[in-house]
Amino acid sequence: MAVDTTTEAKAIARYIRMSPFKVRRVLDQIRGRSYREALIILEFMPYRACEPILKLLRSAVANAEHNQGLDPTTLVVSQAYADGGPSLRRYRPRAQGRAYQIRKPTCHITIAVAPQVEDN
């Protein structure tokens, strides 16, 4: 299966309030799959990370359709990755006047779709 990366369309979601490790677990399942297959997988996976990824995948396909005039039925998820964003720092009061730091991680998710090229 060859993918034409010259006509790649992508979408980026920034500052998603979720750990990048948890998001990567879901992205690994859809990378390299067709758009329709990825939609079905995301609909039925039990993870919280599926919701922003599903929204982002639909956005990437809409970008491909609107900006480059590509057919959604031929699209394949060519790239899918999550990078770490800035962590929100919160403090939890502890005994004897101490405070423990709580890190609330964020991530930036990128999904790119490209049309599948038929091998001759």
From Swiss-Prot:
GO molecular function terms listed in the Swiss-Prot or TrEMBL record: rRNA binding; structural constituent of ribosome
UniProt keyword annotations, A-Z: Ribonucleoprotein, Ribosomal protein, RNA-binding, rRNA-binding
PROSITE patterns: RIBOSOMAL_L22 (PS00464)
Signal peptide as annotated in the record: none
Family matches, as Pfam families: Ribosomal_L22
A Gene Ontology BP annotation from the UniProt entry: translation
One of the record's GO cellular component terms: cytosolic large ribosomal subunit
InterPro entries hit by this protein: Ribosomal_uL22, Ribosomal_uL22_bac/chlpt-type, Ribosomal_uL22_bac/org-type, Ribosomal_uL22_CS, Ribosomal_uL22_sf
Superkingdom of the organism of origin: Bacteria
UniProt cross-references to NCBIfam families, sorted A to Z: rplV_bact
Assembly mode: Part of the 50S ribosomal subunit.
Known role: This protein binds specifically to 23S rRNA; its binding is stimulated by other ribosomal proteins, e.g. L4, L17, and L20. It is important during the early stages of 50S assembly. It makes multiple contacts with different domains of the 23S rRNA in the assembled 50S subunit and ribosome. The globular domain of the protein is located near the polypeptide exit tunnel on the outside of the subunit, while an extended beta-hairpin is found that lines the wall of the exit tunnel in the center of the 70S ribosome.
PANTHER family (UniProt xref): CHLOROPLAST 50S RIBOSOMAL PROTEIN L22-RELATED, LARGE RIBOSOMAL SUBUNIT PROTEIN UL22M
Family: Belongs to the universal ribosomal protein uL22 family.
Protein name: Large ribosomal subunit protein uL22
Native species: Crocosphaera subtropica (strain ATCC 51142 / BH68) (Cyanothece sp. (strain ATCC 51142))
Chain's gene name: rplV
